[in-house]
Structure formats: structure tokens, C-alpha cells
A protein has these predicted regions:
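Polytopic transmembrane helical bundles with strong interfacial aromatic enrichment
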Residues: 1-247, 253-345
């Protein structure tokens, strides 16, 4: 255990921000617990009115916590990149997170919590348009899940920080990813098939997600909305895989360079931040709208779903289009400067 790591500004700020999200979601969860136990729209007592006001406070806390959690994800990636200068051999954030078994677990928990919080925040935005309290209990249950998720995230971040040895000689991404890169970079065999599958799958899945989102925005029916959400969820892993296997090599013009952390470096204008951000925004909007459609079982909720779905699904489509354009730019640039030559031949 390396308590001295707590003196590192990047680590200290990361843990402090994580504690803020835990407190925000924990406070919102207290109200959610009271709602599950005592909320009854048929009652008109002072206690019921107080619960309704507290529900609005809970929504505000979740929204603020979501903003902090998403910013925390970006900050975690940035902190990993900055800490790479303190570890010999680590050329980017990959070497930092790989230096301890807790690194990627912590990063995964931060990303998962950010997406979950984003979806719940979308549901609160939908609930604000519903002229009834039909979603009070489902939202209370969803909010109760955010507190333990953020606590797990903070615990893993603390384990990562306290087990990180800044005095070791770490391996850079090119060394750790050589086995993968050697296969993927080749023009033939399993590696090339994996890259082609990821790239083609991403293009098809994103196109399908955009088409379904625009169709659902034009005609907001539950079935189409849920299908658009499902397409967005399917496109997510394909988009991430294609970013690593196809986009990253073209950014650096090196076929075996498949490190997503290097896409966050200033030397490539930090293209990874808007690219991954657009993918994340599309998934959050899609899932939030899809779950909202599934929860719309009353006339009040269905009436509010139409304008909400139109707005959010257009945002989802534009986010996927932005991600596709950002991913295509390095590939198009390489095709121009190389005279149309393939990077992988």
C-alpha cells in the first residue's frame, strides 16, 4: 500500500471528485427510499407533498451527480495520461492502468457508473415532462442503484491509487499490445478478420442506429423507440472496437498501434475525447429513451413520450453521425496522403 500516492494532485482530485458523486447519489437515494416506503399519489397529506418536493430535489442531485461522474471519467483518463510521466516506461495512460490489477477495473467501474447515471438522468428529464407521478417508483429504484455503483467505483479507484507503485518500470502500450497488434495488423488471418469484422460491424450498426433513431423521432412509437435503443446498444461495442483496431492505427500511421489511450494525447489533438464522448452520448440518449418508452404505461406518460423521444432520438442520431465522422477523418486523411495505399499492406 502506497499512502504517499495520496499526495499526488491528480490522484487526490480523482478521489475527492469520486467522494462527491457518492455523497450526491447517497443523498438522492435516501429520498428514493422514503418514496418507495411512503409515496402514495392518492394521499393529499403534508407528508405526501413533502415527498413530492423531495423527489424534485432527488432529481436535481442525480443530474448534478451525473455531470460530475461523466466529468470524472474524462478526468480519470486525463489523470492516467499525466501520471505516465511519473512512471518509467509508461508512455501513456495504458502503462499507468496496467501497472496494477486494479487499474482497468477502476476505469471500467467509472465508465459503467457514468453511463448508468446518464441513463437515470435521462429518465428524470422524461419524468419532468410527465404530468403525473407514474415514474416515481421506477425512478426511485434506479436512483437506489446509483449509490452502491458510485461507492464501488470510489472503492476501486482507492484500491488502484493505493496499490500503484510509481517507482516501478512499467511497460508501454506498444509492448503490452504487441501480441494483439501483430495479428490485427496483418493483411491476412484472424487478425485481419477481426479488424474487418469490427470495422464493418461498426459501420452497419451505426447506420442502423441512426436510421432507426430518425424513424423513431419522426414516428415516436414504443416498438420503434425500443428498437432504436437496442441498435444503439449493439453499436456501442462495435464502435469501441473499430476505434481501437481501425481508427487508432490510421491516426498514428502505424498498423500495429492499437492503443485507445494514445488517442487522448495532445499530439493528436485529443481526438479520443470527442470520439468516445459522442459514442457515450449516443448510447445514453438511446437507452434513456428506450427505457422511458418501456415505462410509459399511462396516457400521461405516453403523451409526454412523443416530444421527449423526438428530441432525444435526434440527439442520439447526431451523436452517432458525429462519432462516425470523427472516426472517418483519420482514415480519409491517410488515404489522401498515401495516395490511396492501404495501411495494413
Amino acid at each position: 500500500m502506497h499512502l504517499v500516492n495520496l499526495l499526488e494532485p491528480w490522484i487526490l482530485l480523482r478521489l475527492a471528485a469520486g467522494a462527491v458523486t457518492v455523497l450526491l447519489f447517497a443523498r438522492a437515494s435516501l429520498t428514493s427510499w422514503r418514496i418507495l416506503r411512503h409515496f402514495d399519489v392518492a394521499r393529499h397529506s403534508e407528508g405526501q407533498l413533502a415527498l413530492e418536493r423531495r423527489a424534485d430535489l432527488s432529481a436535481a442531485l442525480v443530474r448534478v451527480g451525473t455531470i460530475v461522474q461523466i466529468a470524472l471519467l474524462a478526468f480519470t483518463m486525463l489523470a492516467g495520461d499525466k501520471l505516465s510521466a511519473s512512471i518509467r516506461g509508461a508512455m501513456c495512460g495504458y502503462g499507468v492502468f496496467h501497472a496494477t490489477p486494479w487499474g482497468f477495473r477502476s476505469l471500467g467501474a467509472t465508465a459503467g457508473t457514468a453511463i448508468a447515471a446518464g441513463v437515470v438522468s435521462e429518465l428524470y428529464s422524461f419524468d419532468a415532462r410527465v404530468r403525473s407521478f407514474d415514474l416515481a417508483r421506477p425512478l426511485a429504484i434506479a436512483t437506489l442503484l446509483l449509490a452502491p455503483l458510485s461507492a464501488i467505483d470510489l472503492g476501486l479507484a482507492a484500491a488502484f491509487a493505493l496499490n500503484l507503485d510509481l517507482s516501478v518500470v512499467a511497460s508501454c502500450c506498444s509492448v503490452q499490445l504487441d501480441a494483439v497488434a501483430a495479428g490485427v495488423a496483418g493483411p491476412e488471418g484472424l487478425g485481419a478478420s477481426t479488424r474487418a469484422f469490427a470495422t464493418t460491424g461498426a459501420a452497419v450498426a451505426i447506420a442502423l442506429a441512426v436510421i432507426l433513431a430518425l424513424l423513431a423521432a419522426r414516428r415516436p412509437q414504443r416498438g420503434i423507440i425500443v428498437a432504436a435503443a437496442g441498435a444503439s446498444l449493439v453499436a456501442f461495442p462495435f464502435a469501441v472496437a473499430a476505434t481501437v483496431l481501425e481508427v487508432a492505427p490510421h491516426v498514428f500511421e502505424v498498423p500495429q498501434h492499437v492503443c485507445p489511450f494514445c488517442l487522448l494525447r495532445p499530439s493528436v489533438l485529443g481526438i479520443g475525447y470527442p470520439l468516445f464522448g459522442a459514442i457515450m452520448l449516443a448510447v445514453i440518449c438511446g437507452l434513456g429513451t428506450g427505457i422511458g418508452a418501456l415505462l410509459s404505461r399511462t396516457s400521461a406518460a405516453r403523451s409526454a413520450l412523443t416530444p421527449f423521444a423526438r428530441e432525444r432520438l435526434r440527439r442520439e442520431a447526431f451523436a452517432w453521425i458525429a462519432a462516425f465522422v470523427l472516426a472517418a477523418l483519420p482514415i480519409a486523411r491517410y488515404a489522401i496522403v498515401s495516395g490511396g495505399a492501404s495501411l495494413f499492406h
